[in-house]
């Protein structure tokens, strides 16, 4: 199948609107991607004609809704090549998935004197839950440092592992720098030391195929809203043997086998014991439509188009005076930058006046900002619906801002 960015853009209604009298150039998909009509329509159709509570009724609507929900679990398992759909837990997003692991697996397996390894490039969602866990149990948090080019100092990694290392929690792709970490060698090293590995895949799954069996990671988590799906839904993958041993971290309906006031409560099997309460069924249906949409386009086709666009953007940005780029030359999805000594918020505001949407701030990565000694950065993210013309508009906008502000 030949990838056509024009055909893709036609599927996204918001891309036809104007901002400040100019065509919208949406360069903020790493924060949250826009939604194609196929996703919007699938969720709307479910609420119009198919809605019912799942797992709780024998009537037709409930049975059909349950089947649709479980079919999305199967589709998601194929999307990341899990061995079984029962290795996937529906969560609100990457943040909840990581917190689930920290509070369930972490509370059961990390003790005083143990250690957990993260990196200096992590999103706060892959830092704070581990800080909280370490504070609860008296464990140590160790950090893989950054290089100036935005890669990790991997030569330090073997020195961080010891017999007390319980987990390596690492991002697949940095949400600020676009760095893709060499997961295969990192996971192999962790397993050699008896540690488990959690991968934050929030910035990876939309850019190229992910195979959790080939990676051999123990946990993999991602959000739907960055993958052209709805907000409030994501996927946590856990190897089946681990998942079946993990205790629930939230109690309520759907996650129980029996409840007795005199004899206590027993849990249902995983993954359902981690899905207490009424799920975001509409979001799940929308996620299924997003997975179907992306799969039909072909992730390899998307990857090829996006990489060509990224190479073009990096080359064109060289023409902008006083522009500082952060991150390696080979990157996925994002370009973080600052213009001279101007604050990122000011630059982002000017770009918005030109109809260009970029993200500004610390990007939930304050330790990374501290490493580069800046309070904030601008971040332009490139998705499958972005164009060379939009890159040109970004470059022209930055050149214009430089002329105006000096």
Swiss-Prot record:
Gene (name only): sufS
Protein's recorded name: Cysteine desulfurase
Its EC number(s): 2.8.1.7, 4.4.1.16
Any Pfam family: Aminotran_5
Required cofactor(s): pyridoxal 5'-phosphate
Keywords: Cytoplasm, Lyase, Pyridoxal phosphate, Transferase
Gene Ontology molecular function, alphabetical: cysteine desulfurase activity; pyridoxal phosphate binding; selenocysteine lyase activity
Subunit structure, as described in the record: Homodimer. Interacts with SufE and the SufBCD complex composed of SufB, SufC and SufD. The interaction with SufE is required to mediate the direct transfer of the sulfur atom from the S-sulfanylcysteine.
GO biological process, alphabetically ordered: cysteine metabolic process
Reactions catalysed according to its record: (sulfur carrier)-H + L-cysteine = (sulfur carrier)-SH + L-alanine; L-selenocysteine + AH2 = hydrogenselenide + L-alanine + A + H(+)
Domain of life of the native organism: Bacteria
Subcellular localization, as worded in the UniProt entry: Cytoplasm
Residue numbers bearing the N6-(pyridoxal phosphate)lysine modification: 226
Main location class: cytoplasm
Active-site residues, record numbering mapped to chain: 364
NCBIfam families found in the cross-reference section: PRK09295.1, sufS
Family: Belongs to the class-V pyridoxal-phosphate-dependent aminotransferase family. Csd subfamily.
Gene Ontology CC entries for this record: cytoplasm
Record's keyword annotation contains Membrane: no
Pathway involvement of the protein, from the record: Cofactor biosynthesis; iron-sulfur cluster biosynthesis
Known function: Cysteine desulfurases mobilize the sulfur from L-cysteine to yield L-alanine, an essential step in sulfur metabolism for biosynthesis of a variety of sulfur-containing biomolecules. Component of the suf operon, which is activated and required under specific conditions such as oxidative stress and iron limitation. Acts as a potent selenocysteine lyase in vitro, that mobilizes selenium from L-selenocysteine. Selenocysteine lyase activity is however unsure in vivo.
